[in-house]
Amino acid sequence: MKMLLLLHCLGVFLSCSGHIQDEHPQYHSPPDVVIPVRITGTTRGMTPPGWLSYILPFGGQKHIIHIKVKKLLFSKHLPVFTYTDQGAILEDQPFVQNNCYYHGYVEGDPESLVSLSTCFGGFQGILQINDFAYEIKPLAFSTTFEHLVYKMDSEEKQFSTMRSGFMQNEITCRMEFEEIDNSTQKQSSYVGWWIHFRIVEIVVVIDNYLYIRYERNDSKLLEDLYVIVNIVDSILDVIGVKVLLFGLEIWTNKNLIVVDDVRKSVHLYCKWKSENITPRMQHDTSHLFTTLGLRGLSGIGAFRGMCTPHRSCAIVTFMNKTLGTFSIAVAHHLGHNLGMNHDEDTCRCSQPRCIMHEGNPPITKFSNCSYGDFWEYTVERTKCLLETVHTKDIFNVKRCGNGVVEEGEECDCGPLKHCAKDPCCLSNCTLTDGSTCAFGLCCKDCKFLPSGKVCRKEVNECDLPEWCNGTSHKCPDDFYVEDGIPCKERGYCYEKSCHDRNEQCRRIFGAGANTASETCYKELNTLGDRVGHCGIKNATYIKCNISDVQCGRIQCENVTEIPNMSDHTTVHWARFNDIMCWSTDYHLGMKGPDIGEVKDGTECGIDHICIHRHCVHITILNSNCSPAFCNKRGICNNKHHCHCNYLWDPPNCLIKGYGGSVDSGPPPKRKKKKKFCYLCILLLIVLFILLCCLYRLCKKSKPIKKQQDVQTPSAKEEEKIQRRPHELPPQSQPWVMPSQSQPPVTPSQSHPQVMPSQSQPPVTPSQSQPRVMPSQSQPPVMPSQSHPQLTPSQSQPPVTPSQRQPQLMPSQSQPPVTPS
């Protein structure tokens, strides 16, 4: 076995001659002609948002595929480098349509794979269904959306002359000799099953032979390259690797290295790319695509070369391959870059052979050995892959037009088509006439924002605001409250956040959850496993000391429901003496942040907080800045400077002013004046409402003052009249106010009661007048009518017993009545 391995290590360095192959890809089985049918739902329910579903009838049955648009497949401004006839480098940034590349699965097959592109008039890509791979592409000139589906033959005879090679050095071979006896253990090890999410930024170089094969058609070449990258990304996605096309170079005139010998070609290409590609743009690996034959090899890649500038490379041949088989070959050699060996007989996957088999079959699945190799290499040696595209510099060479403002530039609007729409910046990286800025939080409509304009608001009680200074487009740096300042009930500000155990439990398990008792922390965080620990070192969980148990994993209680968790998150439940403890685990393969770790700055006792999984005294955060230093009129920021309250000025909050700090920019000075104006406006509105109410009251009371009120009988007297009407005096006469002037009347006359200002005409004895309302006409009444009792203050002349006088309301006028 060792002898075979030695021959293998030496064999990859043998020279391999190559020549131009002008052969077209060959399919080994007739295609099925299918018409994809779009559906809106399946037998298992409606299609979820963002997913599309199609029926593809081929292979004797109907397949339902579900696909979704991919994100982060190409660099935002993909650079494409070409050469002039004189050898000068040209750069272009072509438009790349990024909403037509899909990934998905086949309904009913959980291990299926679908990778399709719809950018060029139909489906183009591969499908892995029930251990068989298929390639699909549109039927040329079809008017009915017809497609051709080819089965990618995986028989051994097809690939008997097409092997894979990888470049190793003596150290790598020696390591394999040492590990060869552990192959049995290796086959059952799935330590690589959980892996961190990684981004491989790849630069592709097209050699002149492949460029000629595409008849120098740049557009067609780019179309196929985008499809290849989409397929490779889908294949590597199952191990948590994202492939990002970061750049492209085409050798338009001639090959810049000699590609005719395996050993020399790979070394020459790795050296060339480290001297030419690396200075132009940062990347993780670079592959050279060619049509030259490599003595029966599908390509050759540097083993464990990722993140090493002079070794992160590979050469892959396009000779006699379809897009599907070539994409699988690229993924195979990327696997070598990521530390994967060729599969041995003891390696297994769900198919007879796996993608890292030496024969490079059209299979998309990785074996247990590949997972182990990948994990062993990448866990400590490929930290460059953990950085996202947003944390890396795309271009290392400073130049105008790259969209990055560099030294000597006033602005940079990027490509010409973007500059044409920019009102503030010109294509030569200078400002337009009349503009003072082109970007920044303190720039609006090509002008600086005025002094005191807030450019970054505080987001919580541990944050501080910043204001523009009126002379720059930049907003001051983001400052926040000094670490260790108390917040909420028992918390402390730490790095712009106020962490609280109860809130952390509620974020994980929902409303009602609270931090658990001390028992849960002691019992679980001292285990030193995925459920409870105080950190990870060298892939080993660290047990918490008793003094640090509050700073390990968060432990919760009062959990009534288990919410949906992210991938690979497991909820753990335990009981200790009728105490329920709830928590989440963490393993080395989780892609996102650990929601279950106790955050730094969380309280772990009186005057103690958690820092780096240890419970320390709060005095460790002390500085020369304190509330007393700010004269208790402000608070310290993370630069240990006073951020003064309103009405006081920095640096020490001793002088009257408008607040802020020496770091935050000048706060607005019109705040008090505005408040006074608002108060005046409010008072005026209230005064206006009061005047309106007073006016309406006066208007209603005016007619009442013009009328003379008649004093009505008291309630007691009214009740007396109603209860004993037969006891009225023989002569019932109205009472008159003392100031009344009453003319004499005859015994037969009947007089109504009148107010002092009234004049009463004489009436005949038979005249009888009823009680009427003002302005009413008085009909005659019988003499037997009774009269209301009058107040004692009135004086009344004598009348006859037959006289009955009705009471009249004020302002009534009594006309004379003739005797009946």
Swiss-Prot record:
Domain Peptidase M12B: 198-390
Subcellular locations according to the entry: Membrane
Pfam families for this protein: ADAM_CR, Disintegrin, Pep_M12B_propep, Reprolysin
InterPro entries, A to Z: ADAM_Cys-rich, Disintegrin_CS, Disintegrin_dom, Disintegrin_dom_sf, MetalloPept_cat_dom_sf, Peptidase_M12B, Peptidase_M12B_N, Reprolysin_adamalysin
Gene Ontology terms describing biological process: male gonad development; proteolysis; spermatogenesis
Main location: membrane
Every EGF-like domain range: 625-654
Keywords: Disulfide bond, EGF-like domain, Glycoprotein, Membrane, Repeat, Signal, Transmembrane, Transmembrane helix
Variant or mutagenesis effect after changing residue 234 to F: In a cutaneous metastatic melanoma sample; somatic mutation
Glycosylation, residue list: 217, 320, 368, 428, 469, 538, 545, 558, 564
Effect annotated for changing residue 131 to N: In a cutaneous metastatic melanoma sample; somatic mutation
Outcome, altering residue 533 to Y: In a cutaneous metastatic melanoma sample; somatic mutation
Protein purpose: May be involved in spermatogenesis and fertilization. Seems to be a non catalytic metalloprotease-like protein.
Protein name according to UniProt: Disintegrin and metalloproteinase domain-containing protein 29
Species assigned in the record: Homo sapiens
